[in-house]
Regions:
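RNase H-like, Mg2+-dependent phosphodiesterase core
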Residues: 1-202
């Protein structure tokens, strides 16, 4: 299986676009918690070893790469859109919002942005393109996928301490049988997305 590489970023650099940021999200599908987005500008001389789409990595591999990315990347930022914002503006717009927030939070301003997927956020203020399966192809996007996933998972573990009945540390807000059973027994908590099923059907 092909691993993500830095060719797209190098090509953009030869065309005068530098630095280049990769952006990816985590947590579009869960019934609870925020959606997270990360933006990463990698240092081409210090590329993390073993970069891959976060979904293809074990938790231990993700944690190792998370630390390595934070240590060696030129710039890293993570941002969220809350469950309340998701309910107010819908998950698609909330994902765009988190991506814009992450981009603005970078300590360096990129001249080009590569985004996972096929849905380009509006109003980014810098040239950008989407790449389907970008987290499996593009090093900067893969790094962003790891940062977003690990950051969101750690947040949901903290939320679990506030609301232990839902066992968020086991499923991170996704609609597992155990999570649905806890919702049926206890009702929603403030971190649930009330615009999502099963809440809309209650």
């Amino acid at each position: 299986m092909t691993k993500p590489d830095f060719r797209a970023e190098r090509d953009l650099r030869t065309r005068g676009f530098w630095p280049v940021a990769g952006i990816d999200e985590a947590g579009r599908g869960p019934l609870a918690g925020p959606v997270a987005a990360a933006a990463v500008i990698l240092d081409p001389s210090k590329l993390p070893r073993g970069l891959n789409d976060s979904k293809q990595l074990t938790p231990g591999e993700r944690d190792r790469l998370y630390d390595e990315i934070l240590l060696h990347a030129s710039a890293v930022a993570v941002a969220f859109a809350s469950a309340a914002e998701i309910d107010q503006i819908n998950i698609r717009q909330a994902t765009f919002l988190a991506m814009r927030r992450a981009l603005l939070a970078l300590s360096a301003t990129p001249n080009y942005v590569l985004i996972d997927g096929n849905d380009l956020p509006p109003d980014l203020c810098v040239p950008a393109e989407t790449i389907i399966k970008g987290d499996a192809l593009i090093a900067s996007i893969a790094a962003a996928s790891i940062i977003a996933k690990v950051t969101r998972d750690r947040l949901m573990r903290r939320v679990c301490r506030l609301y232990p009945a839902y066992r968020f540390s086991q499923h991170f807000g996704y609609g597992t049988k155990a999570h649905l059973a806890a919702i049926a027994e206890h009702g929603p908590c403030p971190f649930h997305r009330l615009s999502f099923r099963p809440f809309r059907e209650a």
